Amino acid sequence: MVLLSITLLIAGLAISGITLIAIVLSIANPEKRLWPPHHYTRITPMIVWIPTFTLALILICLGILGWGTLPLPTWLRYGIGIPVIVLSNAAVWYEALQFGMAQTGGAKGTLRTTGFYRYSRNPQYVADSMMVAGWSILSAAPLT
């Protein structure tokens, strides 16, 4: 179990590191940016969603493997963790559907200023972060 957890942790850190490098390179050299893509093709969603869902699966697995390891009270785990996961998941999917899956995956679109975009330029990322926080609280696992 420890070896599996370490392997998953390394894989998750690698995906996160590669993503961070792509973002930094895109900011540093916009003409050769990796994100958002210059041209949206059929493989663009795969490039975006495979690492994203792989990282989510890794976080789920790490939470299951370390379930209940941290001494968090039950009321906190279930009373806060579950509602945060449910509400943030609803926010992500609501905005993704309003935004359009292609534009969410990097296709050109229009500036949105309605819905949660009234409050943040990146509400899906904010909600994704909240979802991870909710899962960390619920699972009470040290590696999430």
Annotate each predicted stretch with a short phrase.
Residues 1-113, 129-144:
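Membrane-anchoring alpha-helices and their flanking helix-loop junctions
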Residues 112-122:
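Short, amphipathic, aromatic/basic-enriched membrane-interface segments that mark the entry/exit
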Residues 121-131:
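Hydrophobic alpha-helical membrane segments
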